[in-house]
Regions:
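Gly-rich Lys/Arg/Thr-decorated short loops/hinges at beta-loop-alpha junctions or inter-strand turns
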Residues: 59-62, 87-92, 118-122, 194-203
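Metal-associated gating/positioning segment near the N- to mid-region
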Residues: 51-113
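Histidine/acidic residue-rich metal-binding segments in metalloenzymes
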Residues: 134-228
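Alpha-helix-loop-beta-strand connector modules within alpha/beta enzyme cores
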Residues: 103-120, 168-179
Length: 231
């Protein structure tokens, strides 16, 4: 199968391309950009006028609903939605039900995604058991099962000693820690940005400092433990 995609805006950061060019595909692989390969005859031509042609996008925090939330959506439906939007790779936070804190659960998710054979799924293992912020998980075993990093999803670790040990352990093995910076006590019960609108609507506000203080703490611990963070 040979496909000619014409008139699209080609964006390819790796090769420093951002221009209106044609793309030529053969046997599922890009055979040429800008100029057709010798002897290329397309079986299908796609007019991509006013559209962007680019490598598959990566969603760094995609709730895939499985396991535990199939009443909302399924892994298959979420992956289909991702592909329809040009997202071909999905990083999955560990706040499923059950939490991704056991190798068997990670292997099950990876196997299910492989069976569906649509988007690539990259699980993030739980940084602490049950995301409770008390006991760090067996990161090495989770990594071997397929986790590409470790996260607390949207749940902050209140005990900085636990966070320190978790980041220190991750640094030892070169694992990346993904954290949402939020000072839990300042943000407690908040539902909106702390400001005029929240006050007018009678909503409990979250001050900006809830994020900046958490960022400062995370960066300081990262500096001391020499760990790699994504926030």
């Amino acid at each position: 199968m040979k496909i000619h995609i014409k008139n699209g805006r080609v964006i390819d950061p790796k090769n420093n391309i951002d221009a209106k060019q044609d793309v030529f595909i053969a046997a599922g692989k890009i055979a040429g950009i800008g100029k057709a390969p010798e002897g290329f005859t397309a079986n299908q031509t796609i007019d991509a006028s006013n559209l962007i042609v680019c490598p598959g996008l990566v969603d760094l925090s995609a709730r895939l609903r499985e396991p535990g939330f199939e009443h909302k959506a399924t892994l298959e439906s979420e992956m289909q939605a991702a592909i329809a939007g040009g997202v071909t790779s999905l990083a999955c936070p560990p706040d499923t039900d059950p939490v991704l804190d056991e190798p068997g659960l990670v292997e099950m998710l990876k196997h299910r995604a492989k069976q569906l054979n649509q988007a690539h799924v990259y699980p993030l293992g739980a940084l602490t058991h049950q995301l409770a912020g008390k006991e760090i998980t067996e990161m090495c075993e989770l990594n071997e099962a397929g986790c590409v990093g470790f996260s607390q999803a949207d749940i902050a670790i209140k005990d900085t000693q636990v966070l320190w040990r978790a980041m220190q352990y991750a640094a030892t093995f070169g694992f990346t820690v993904w954290l949402r910076p939020e000072e839990p006590y300042l943000a407690k019960d908040g539902v909106a940005h702390d400001g005029e609108v929240a006050a007018r609507l009678g909503l409990k506000g979250i001050p900006s400092a809830a994020e900046t203080l958490a960022i400062a703490s995370i960066l300081r611990i990262a500096q001391e433990t020499r760990s790699e963070e994504h926030t």
